[in-house]
Amino acid sequence: MQRIIGTEVEYGISSPSDPTANPILTSTQAVLAYAAAAGIQRAKRTRWDYEVESPLRDARGFDLSRSAGPPPVVDADEVGAANMILTNGARLYVDHAHPEYSAPECTDPLDAVIWDKAGERVMEAAARHVASVPGAAKLQLYKNNVDGKGASYGSHENYLMSRQTPFSAIITGLTPFLVSRQVVTGSGRVGIGPSGDEPGFQLSQRSDYIEVEVGLETTLKRGIINTRDEPHADADRYRRLHVIIGDANLAETSTYLKLGTTALVLDLIEEGPAHAIDLTDLALARPVHAVHAISRDPSLRATVALADGRELTGLALQRIYLDRVAKLVDSRDPDPRAADIVETWAHVLDQLERDPMDCAELLDWPAKLRLLDGFRQRENLSWSAPRLHLVDLQYSDVRLDKGLYNRLVARGSMKRLVTEHQVLSAVENPPTDTRAYFRGECLRRFGADIAAASWDSVIFDLGGDSLVRIPTLEPLRGSKAHVGALLDSVDSAVELVEQLTAEPR
C-alpha cells in the first residue's frame, strides 16, 4: 500500500474555571503556548502559506461563490489565526473555535495511526503549557466531535487519488461503504439527535450531522461525500478525497481500520473495473437515512434499503466490501499491510456479529458502551441521566491520567497497535517516506530561515529582496531516500536552496 493518507482533528476545548471563556481565545492560547514551549519565538514562528488554498473549489467542476467581496486576507497575528508547522511535518493551528492538529502525510495506515496519536500528545502538552502561564485559565482538551449543545466539529481524513478516476465512480462506490463503516469506526455517543436530547446511545458522534448525500461544505449541509477539490499536489495528476463523515477515534484499531479499509476500497474503485469487480449493486435507496438508522442501533440488527429493494444491515454491507477487497488484494502481488488490514477487518466483523462487546478491547464504541453500561447498572441510571454525558466526555479527555480511554489503556483493557515510544518519536519527527520529511526537517534544521510553509511548498527568507518558494507538489518526493543525503550535506538554508535551485548540468 502506498496511497498518501492523513488525518486532521479539531479538538474540543473547555475552561472549567471560566465557563464564559472565549474558545477562540483559549484555542489560540493553546497553540501559542505549545509554540513557546518548543522555543519558537513569535517573530520567528513559521507562517502558513495560504496562497495555494482553494477551499471553495468543487470536485464536480465549479467554484462555490463567496457571499460577497474578495477572498479574505488572513492576518497571522490575529487572535484565532495562531498557526505553526511542527518538526514532525504536522500543522497545529486554530480552526474556527478549536485547536486543530493536521497530521503529516503517510503512506502506511499504521504510520497514520502513530502520527494521529502523536496529535493527542501534542494537545495534552499544549494544555499543560497553558496551565503553567501565570494567570491563564486551565484548559481541558477532548478528542471528540460534539459539544453537547448541538454543534459538531470535524475529524477529517484525506486520501490522494488519481485525477483519472471519475468523481461519479467515487460517489457510487464509496457511499455505501462510508454509510456502513461506522459499525467499526464509530466512537460512540450518548444522546440521539444533533443536541443529544433524545435518550439513548448510538455508534457515531458524527452521523446526526450528515444532511445530504454529496456536498462541498463541512460546517453545514454536511455530505456523506465531500466534494472539496483542493489536492495540495499536482492538480493535473491528483485529487485529494476529503472525508468528513468520520468520528475522532482514540482506539488504535478503530483508526487503523478506518484509514486502512477506506484506502483499500479506494483501490477497489480505481482498479476494480480491470478485475471485473463492480460496486453499483450496493447503491442505497436513502443514504442519509441509512447513516442515521445504522448509527442508532447498537445491536447492529437495523437494516437499510438498497436501491434494488434488498434490505441489509451495516455489518452485511461491510462484509460485502470486505469480500470484494479481499478478492482484489489476492489478485495483486503480496502486500503484508493490505493482507493485515483484510485479516483484522474480517476478525472484527466476526466478533461484532457474535457479540459487539467482544470488541470492547479493540474499538471505541463498544469500549465506551461497556463503560456506560457498567456505570448505569452500578448507579441504577436510565439513558436520560445527565451523568452519562459526562462519562462520554471523559472518555475523550486527552490527559493520560484522567481520560477514561487512556485509563483503559493503562490497565491493559484496550489493545494497542503501536508503542508509546513510537508515538513520542512521532511528536518530534516526520514520516520518512513522504514530502513531510522535507518539510519537517527543514523546520528542525533551518526554522529561523523559513517564512512560511504549506502542504505543497516551503518558503525561505534568506535575507534577500524576495522570498524563495520551494514547491513540493509531488507527495512522494521529499522523502528521506530522496533528500536525506542532501539535507545532511548542507550547513545552512542558503546552501540548501542553492542546491535545490541550481541549474542541472
Swiss-Prot record:
Active site: D95
Gene knockout outcome: Disruption of dop abolishes pupylation. Cells lacking this gene also become hypersensitive to reactive nitrogen intermediates (RNI) and are severely attenuated for survival and growth in mice. They also cannot depupylate proteasome substrates.
Impact after mutating R222A: Abolishes pupylation
Lineage of producing organism: Bacteria, Bacillati, Actinomycetota, Actinomycetes, Mycobacteriales
EC numbers: 3.4.-.-, 3.5.1.119
One GO BP: modification-dependent protein catabolic process
Result of altering E10A: Abolishes pupylation and depupylase activity
Name recorded for this polypeptide: Pup deamidase/depupylase
Cofactor stoichiometry and binding remark: ATP is required for the deamidation and depupylation reactions but is not hydrolyzed during the reactions.
Main function: Specifically catalyzes the deamidation of the C-terminal glutamine of the prokaryotic ubiquitin-like protein Pup to glutamate, thereby rendering Pup competent for conjugation. Also displays depupylase (DPUP) activity, removing conjugated Pup from target proteins; is thus involved in the recycling of Pup and may function similarly to deubiquitinases (DUBs) in eukaryotes to prevent or promote proteasomal degradation of certain proteins.
Family classification: Belongs to the Pup ligase/Pup deamidase family. Pup deamidase subfamily.
Residues reported to bind ATP: G6, T7, E8, V9, E10, S102, A103, N158, R240
Binding sites annotated in the UniProt record for Mg(2+) 1: E8, Y93, E100
